[in-house]
Amino acid sequence: MEYDSLLELVKKRRSIRRFKPDPIPDESVEKIIDVARWAPSGLNIQPWEFVVVKDRELKDRIVKLSEAGGPLPRDPMDFSNAPVYIILLGDPRTKAGLPPRLAANNEMNQPVFNSSLASAFLYMHLAAAALGLASQWMSRVGLPFMQPELKKLLGIPEGFQVYDMMVVGYPAIKAREKLLRPKDKMIHYGAAEKDDFRTDEEVEDFANRTRTWAMATIGRDKD
């Protein structure tokens, strides 16, 4: 793949909260997971497992579990109409494949474990975009209030980590243009000075602007 093609795919990947009711083929789900399993992982331990949920009753129960933690401001559980949920799990037993000193120290090996899962999750979203599908992160599934109940619901082994969930389907709307920081403001070569980075005021200004953009996007997705 050429760089320009990769960049176009990355730009195409956007979080969408409104989906068409049309089901997506099992083949598309398998293609998403096939891409994800090629993601990099620490010493190739491949800690991931994937739970695919299509059953309406199960999806409704996942939504109810999500709501138990309280709705986010202006962001109700609007992922509920997606035809497929894909939950990414991490199997901590795979840490045994790391070097012994690293495998024995959870404080040191957990970042490797999390980074491996993060890579697979990003690959899932890029694969969905390449297939013309819309996707949305639902990280709430990994929070302490939800993990135990979700594991019970789906028969997930107790020791596993619920990393994240992607909801996926055909987009019902077109994504808005994304608000991005200027590239030249975020690249630093070699040792940098404090003045090379944004001031507190600049960070706050962008945070306010991107929050406004995000809330407008969420509101549009729900209309």
Positions of PLM-derived features:
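Acidic, surface-exposed loops and disordered segments
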Residues: 1-223
